[in-house]
Amino acid sequence: RYDTQLLIEGENLDEDVINEYFTENFKGDCLLAVGDEELIKIHFHTNEPWKVLEYCRTLGEIYDIVVEDMDRQARGLHG
């Protein structure tokens, strides 16, 4: 339901490890975790965006956070 996007800035980030953690621990789809050892972009559709943010915060600084309600978007509403 929620389109969750953010950037993680840190050290020794590993997109494969992040992908695996998401797959094993979060319900959702459309996962994209790309970047390098210092910056990873996350895109994920989930009903529990707060869990995604909590985990990502353990990896480094998170910013450019966007959480959009796709149900509202589908009905033509904003937010």
Predicted regions mapped to residue ranges:
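N-terminal loops that bind phosphate or other acidic moieties
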Residues: 1-79
